Each structure stands twice: as structure tokens, then as C-alpha cells.
Amino acid sequence: NSVYPLKTEEVDLIWRLLRMRLAVSIVNSTHLASKNKQDPYITISQAPAWKFLENFNINESLLKARLRTVCGMPAVEGADRIIEWINNESSKFSPLLGTDLTNLEIKSLSVENISIPQNPFELTSDEARDIGFELGKRADIWLGYYNEPRLIYTAPAFRMGPWKASNRRTVHLAIDIFAESGTKLFAPLEGEVFTAEYRDNELDYGGVIILKHTTPNKDEFFTLYGHLDPIFMKNLKLGDKIEKGQSFCQLGSPDVNGGWAPHVHFQLALTTDGIEADWPGVADPDDLTFWNAICPNPASLLNLKDADCLYQPSKKQEVLNDRRKYFGGNLSVSYDNPILISRAWRHHIFDEWGRPYLDAYNNVPHVGHSHPRINQVALDQLNKVNSNTRYLNPLQTQFAKKILSKFPSNFEVCYLVNSGSEANELALRLAREHSGKKGIITPDEGYFGNTTGALSISAYKFKKPNGVGQA
């Protein structure tokens, strides 16, 4: 497509042509095998080909949309017209909560900005119910961003494999409005009930409604309202007409809304082909371009500006450029494509989009990143006093006793320092003072620190061409 641009009709045929080509290969190999019965290689690929053709589980509508997106085309027919109409009508839609949302505060639940959940692989029920408490927004009405990477989605449904770190869906495809349970919702525009269900799994939607809407040009689009009180099930049914401004549901409490702090998950979709009523509310960051095309920013339907509700993570290249500008040039950064770390837990680190990486490289995993007991001990002590060893404190000697208890009895004293570089520097001074000698035997490899003394015994530094500083 980049060399010879395809038409939409041609892109839509790719999936059928692919299957046709595979079927032709099977036919050809069968025909050749009938004439060369002693050559098993001819039909070696038939079994996997048949297995694919008979068992593939790929929705054709979604695949068409994916191929269109990859080729830079609108994902669905009429997408541009729908977005243009919604943007032109913005400020005219009925307020979803019956009141203007323009001046409400937008708070971030992103991987960069909050430490919930404490364990990024397991959101607790208390944490889910208290979302916003850490931000000081437990009772107020406030908004949550579209396109925001979050680590609060930890249920098995949010990953694409057997492991807790398997291709997690983290990026929020809706705008959240947090308010008290029982708050009534009013239809932003005229619609028809497409789905009205109660999904009672933990951390699911609870009550959920999908409305179908039609523009004056007869283009259809859909809005989803999640985490509702399922009381609407008593009087709403599929096909019911909902008038603009009509109250049609209310926010559910954690007992009925999937276990979350009361809010509505408000999402826009330009099609339901291939997803029907089972919309992904969050997307894999590596699949985000496609899902942004299917479920674009719904801010205009709330009479808000897209840019105000769109979350922008820290930009890796900008951070890297600033690092090069403000740090010394000899300070290296790992990997040609560096990881922008936003959080860490035990033996995993997470980037700005919530992707997990196994950390088997750094020293911190000796006890694990963000160890809750160690964090709490450090926090408690920082809240009391954080000074140095020129003053008396019983914790210093208690710590020294505990360290010495792990060593042979001829180790009698210890020095408390802040880093390995300082420890090695002090060890050099003590050894030279005690022995009266300067020579040091060290391995050819190994990092001993960044002080002058530590570098002087680091062969990997001074044995390089033009290396200097050997002790």
C-alpha cells in the first residue's frame, strides 16, 4: 500500500484472497501428490493449512477494519462523517449527568501518577472501591481520562495469555465520570437500546447499556454506559427508544457495579461488527491504533474538548533528549530503544503504557521492587527523623548488631554508608591503612563503583584503549 496505494474495496478482499490462496495451495499439492506418490514433501503443509481453514477464529469485519487502519483508511464506512457530525453538534448534546461538566477536574489514574494497585497484578476489592481516595476525590464529581494507561485492570479477562504479565490491556478507551451511586444519567442524544445487561463478574461492568444512534446522513454509531445500577432491567428492553435528555439509568454502588467506586464508563464506538455487545473497555497498548479508530474519544458527546480529556503519557524521546542535554555524556542508558520506567513491583518494571518487563538485571530485585514492608519501614522512619551518624539513635546500633550477627565473630564493627561505591572506597582506605600497601588484586570484570578509588581497581575501565587510572 505504501508503494502502490490500494482502494478500500481491494483492502476488503485481502482476507478472502488469503484463504483462497491457501485453498489453491492445498488443491495443487493434492494434484501433484497424485502423480508423485513417493514424495511426501509435496503435501507436508496440508495438515496445518486444513487446520487453519477449518478452525480459524477471526472475525472478518474486525479484520477488514484492522487492514483498513493499517493502510491509513477509516476503519469503518462513514467514520469521518460520524466524527465530523459529533464534533459539529458538540455543546448541543444533553448533559449526561444533567449538569455542565466543563469545569470538572480531570484526575489521572495512570501508571505514572498513582500507586494503585499496590500489587499491579492484583487489584484488591478495597482498592477498587476506593479509587479516587488517593487523589482526594472520593466524594466529589470528577472525570477520568480517555486513552489513559492504567494498572487497575488485573482480572484474567484483561490479558491475552496464561500469565499475569501476558499482553495486558491497560489503555482506557472511555471517559469516566465519578459521582455518588444513584446519580441519574440522561441520554446525550436520541437513541435506541441495543444492549441492556447485568454483568455480575468481579471487576466487570455490573449494569451496562449500549445505545444505537443515527446521524442525519443515516450513519450509525453507538454509546456504552457501564457500572450502572441494574434496576434499569425492570423497564428497559432491546429496541426501546430513548429520547434526548431522558433519564434512563443511574450509577450503581460497588455491590452491583462490578465492585468499583461509583462512576460511569462512557464509551463511543463507530461499529459493533465483530464486537457486538462485548466491547473492550481497555486496549493493549500495542493494539491501540486500531482500537482508537473503532472507539475514538467521546469527549464531544459530553460537550467537552477532545484535547482536554485525552491523556498524554510522558514522551520517551523527549525524556531521552533531556537526559542527553542535562546529564553527562558518559552516563550510559541501557538498550538502543530505552525503557521509560513508570512503576515497579517485585521482579517486574512497567513502562509509561503499563507494559510489564521482567527485571533480572538490577540489584533491587534482591528484595523486590516496591517491597511493601521495606517501603513502610522507610516511610515510618522518614516521618520521624532522617539525619546521620553524628547523632545518637538506637536504630543505628540495632542495625549494626543485626548485620554483625550474620558474620563470623572476628568481624566486630561496621560502617554505615549510602552506596556500594562508598563501601568499596572505605574498604580500600582501611586495607591500605592497615597493610601499608597499595597494590590490589581484582578480577578483570565487575563493577566496583564510580569513585576515583573504585575506578582505579576496575579493569574494565583502565584496560580499554587509552584507559587511565589503574591503581
Question: Which residues does each predicted region cover?
Answer:
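ATP/Mg2+ or Mg2+-diphosphate-binding catalytic cores
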Residues: 25-80
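Acidic, glycine-rich catalytic/binding loops that coordinate metals and/or anionic ligands
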Residues: 92-112, 234-246, 250-256, 260-313
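Active-site-adjacent loop/helix segments that line or gate small-molecule/cofactor pockets in enzymes
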Residues: 313-344, 363
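PLP-dependent aspartate aminotransferase-fold enzymes
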Residues: 401-471
